[in-house]
């Protein structure tokens, strides 16, 4: 049962081959048996089965929609009533929210059944899921490797088939990079497309929620429920509702030959994504995927994104600056861990934050406070914002000659657990291909397209697909065409 995609599970429920309760029980058993992966931080079988029973009642009445009764796991950055909501931090280790995040509420309203909360890098700050207060997550493909981050628990859960789908968030690549490392499909929508209400904030001008699942078609189904205007989120964009599945299985242009469904599609290949720093095995795998697109009728077009390298320093000025402000609320008074012993109020603030936050979060708070301080604001923060606008303009220039942009989601396959923990700069460099997309607010996704070579032969590679603003439906169409022609997204780790 767990090998089935969301679409296949929906058909199984409709045909009464299984019930929502049976589905939930099956996945709960798998989660319990795979505790060593550490993908989940909180599971409550009673809450899950109660939701499943309600879904079965809906289905029995002939009601319900496309997602009714289907299980999903939520990244622990989305507050979820009934489950703990920790953001992977000791600071919120015992926090229980009195309300659901909009993303959670919409998926529950669509009839989905929550399996539990997935592990993550603390406050979504990290690229390996080693920064969690609840321990590192292991990659199901190779348990000596990281699953990516910060949505590593979600990517590992979907890869190990502990859940058919999961929510994630992406600030600088935290859906796309773990999707690449774990061999699953994940999409970061256009900034403002999915509500941030109830999503514990890291960097408010960058954070965006999105789905992770086996396939592009599954992600499209989930995005139908997740996306939409929310008046409680000041960054939410008012757009007409759309069906993200509407182009799936359709030719790129009317009249295309069945063997060349993507004829007319122009794929931009940034020179900067294929230069120094890209591992040879990743390059070979991406090249093979691009040849598959050519076989489907697409045309490859060279483009340039000249400020790609600057995306790293720009991101690591802007994101920590916003984080230092957002995380100031966690002081042990109203929110977060409070030190057991302290002398006065100031001492309580110091000790509570020192005990509650992990090393990477402290590092970014310090960086953010520095770049916002008097004398440095103009030199760092304002300059970073100017370059951010240039990066966004570079993408618009590139889209004049192509419909989508493609390249690797990460310069390497997943690295070994502990390999980069002592060198944060090396960890930051792993996001070079995803950061600029986030800075521009564009939609991007990663789809499985093969594996590394040699010692990395069991470590997945993801192809990144980047679209222009609000072009998710076309991006999903392009990804779906690739997945109809290949089976990389159907492959699973040994033993699964």
From Swiss-Prot:
Q: Which family does it belong to?
A: Belongs to the amidase family. GatA subfamily.
Entry protein name = Glutamyl-tRNA(Gln) amidotransferase subunit A
Provide a GO CC annotation, any one.
Answer: glutamyl-tRNA(Gln) amidotransferase complex
Which enzyme type, at the first EC level?
ligase
* Lineage of producing organism: Bacteria, Pseudomonadati, Pseudomonadota, Betaproteobacteria, Burkholderiales
What GO MF terms are annotated? ATP binding; glutaminyl-tRNA synthase (glutamine-hydrolyzing) activity
Native organism: Burkholderia cenocepacia (strain ATCC BAA-245 / DSM 16553 / LMG 16656 / NCTC 13227 / J2315 / CF5610) (Burkholderia cepacia (strain J2315))
SUPFAM superfamilies registered for this protein in UniProt: Amidase signature (AS) enzymes
Report any Pfam family annotated for this entry: Amidase
Q: Which InterPro entries match?
A: Amidase, Amidase_CS, Amidase_dom, AS_sf, GatA
| Reaction(s) catalysed (UniProt annotation) | L-glutamyl-tRNA(Gln) + L-glutamine + ATP + H2O = L-glutaminyl-tRNA(Gln) + L-glutamate + ADP + phosphate + H(+)
Task: Provide the alphabetized UniProt keywords.
Answer: ATP-binding, Ligase, Nucleotide-binding, Protein biosynthesis
């Amino acid at each position: 049962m767990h090998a089935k995609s969301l679409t296949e599970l929906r058909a199984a429920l409709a045909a009464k081959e299984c019930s929502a309760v049976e589905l939930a029980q099956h996945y709960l058993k798998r989660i319990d048996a795979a505790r060593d992966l550490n993908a989940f931080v909180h599971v409550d079988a009673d809450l899950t089965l109660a939701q499943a029973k309600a879904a079965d009642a809906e289905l029995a009445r002939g009601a319900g929609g496309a997602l009714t009764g289907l299980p999903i796991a939520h990244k622990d950055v989305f507050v979820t009533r009934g489950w703990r909501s920790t953001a992977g931090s000791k600071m919120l280790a015992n926090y229980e929210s009195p309300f659901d995040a909009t993303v959670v509420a919409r998926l529950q309203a669509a009839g989905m059944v929550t399996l539990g909360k997935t592990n993550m890098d603390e406050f979504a700050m990290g690229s390996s899921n080693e920064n969690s207060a609840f321990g590192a997550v292991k990659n199901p493909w190779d348990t000596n490797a990281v699953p990516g981050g910060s949505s590593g628990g979600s990517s590992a859960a979907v890869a190990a088939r502990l859940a058919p789908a999961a929510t994630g968030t992406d600030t600088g690549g935290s859906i796309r990079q773990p999707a690449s490392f774990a061999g699953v499909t994940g999409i970061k929508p256009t900034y403002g497309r999915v509500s941030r209400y109830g999503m514990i904030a890291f960097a408010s001008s960058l954070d965006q929620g999105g789905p992770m699942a086996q396939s592009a078609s599954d992600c499209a189904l989930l995005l139908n429920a997740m996306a939409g205007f929310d008046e409680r989120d000041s960054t939410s964009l008012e757009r007409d509702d759309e069906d993200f599945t509407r182009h799936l299985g359709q030719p790129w242009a009317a009249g295309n030959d069945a063997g060349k469904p993507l004829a007319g599609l122009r794929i931009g290949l940034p020179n900067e994504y294929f230069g120094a720093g890209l591992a040879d095995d990743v390059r070979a795998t991406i090249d093979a995927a691009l040849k598959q697109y050519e076989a489907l009728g697409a045309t490859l077009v060279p483009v340039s994104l000249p400020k790609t390298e600057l995306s790293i320093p720009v991101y690591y000025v802007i994101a920590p600056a916003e984080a230092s402000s957002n995380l100031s609320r966690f002081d042990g008074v109203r929110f977060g861990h409070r030190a057991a012993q302290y002398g006065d109020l100031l001492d309580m603030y110091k000790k509570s934050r020192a005990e509650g936050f992990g090393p990477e979060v402290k590092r970014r708070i310090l960086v953010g406070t520095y770049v916002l301080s008097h004398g440095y604001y103009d030199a760092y923060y304002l300059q970073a914002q100017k370059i951010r606008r240039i990066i966004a303009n570079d993408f618009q220039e590139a889209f004049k000659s192509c419909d989508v942009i493609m390249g690797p989601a990460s310069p390497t396959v997943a690295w070994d657990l502990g390999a980069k923990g002592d060198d944060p700069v090396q960890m930051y460099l792993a996001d070079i291909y995803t950061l600029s997309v986030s800075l521009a607010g564009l939609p991007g996704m990663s789809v499985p397209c093969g594996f590394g070579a040699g010692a990395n032969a069991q470590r997945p590679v993801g192809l990144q697909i980047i679209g222009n603003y609000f072009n998710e439906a076309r991006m999903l169409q392009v990804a779906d065409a690739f997945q109809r022609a290949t089976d990389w997204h159907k492959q699973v780790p040994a033993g699964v």
